[in-house]
């Protein structure tokens, strides 16, 4: 179930403040609430990751614009407690998700959020079947053609285990394979558990690109 605004503030704000005393690294906060994000910006956060794509709180978009913040707009069907229990049927998952993200990005622009501060995420595992997830990752280039950075959250997710049969903590190799494919298709940001291993993958991929056919 969703936690209250008060509990969310108690959990998140002290952590942001603590990190800010040690590092200037950009910080992302997962929230759907404008009040939480307002406090997060004040504490030093730079990015709002909203799984509702600015649909849950009508004041969040204008707040982000006012604070000159960035936003991740994610696609999902249903709510986190039930979305994988009652899976929706898509006519064409790729075009439907892309159209939705395009519409939400236009909404964000209308709120006043700068184009370069809008990021899209096709929402792997959020109301999708295993096949849906693979279709979306395979079509990553179709999403980057919208002109916004694409964030992908693939790490250790069940679509990998469905193929490899491995438990979440054993899905590193599958995660790296999916990550490499998405990045080659144009994904700009990856959310991971295994940062060091992913960094090595990206360094080698970057080096290989220097010698590719142009």
Feature-to-residue mapping (PLM):
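Phosphate/pyrophosphate-binding loops at sites that engage ATP/ADP/AMP, CoA/4′-phosphopantetheine
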Residues: 104-117
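Short strand-loop junctions, especially beta-strand C-caps/beta-turns
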Residues: 123-125
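Active-site-adjacent loop and "lid" segments of alpha/beta metabolic enzymes
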Residues: 1-26, 31-35, 41-42, 46-107, ...
């Amino acid at each position: 179930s969703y936690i209250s605004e008060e509990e969310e503030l108690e959990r998140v704000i002290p952590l942001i403040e603590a990190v800010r005393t040690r590092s200037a690294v950009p910080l992302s906060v997962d929230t759907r609430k404008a009040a939480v994000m307002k406090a997060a910006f004040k504490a030093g956060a730079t990015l709002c990751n909203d799984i509702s794509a600015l649909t849950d709180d009508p004041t969040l978009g204008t707040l982000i614009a006012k604070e000159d913040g960035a936003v991740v707009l994610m696609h999902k069907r249903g709510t986190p407690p039930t979305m994988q229990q009652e899976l929706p049927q898509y006519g064409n998952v790729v075009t439907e998700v892309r159209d939705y993200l395009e519409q939400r990005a236009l909404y964000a622009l209308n709120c006043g959020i700068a184009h370069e501060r809008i990021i899209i995420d096709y929402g792997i595992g959020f109301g999708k079947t295993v096949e849906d997830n693979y279709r979306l990752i395979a079509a990553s280039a179709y999403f980057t053609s919208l002109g916004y950075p694409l964030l992908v959250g693939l790490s250790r997710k069940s679509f990998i285990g469905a193929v490899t049969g491995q438990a979440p903590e054993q899905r590193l190799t599958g995660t790296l394979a999916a990550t490499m494919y998405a990045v080659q298709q144009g994904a700009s940001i990856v959310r991971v558990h295994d940062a060091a291993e992913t960094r090595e993958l990206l360094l080698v991929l970057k080096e290989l690109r220097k010698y590719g056919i142009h």
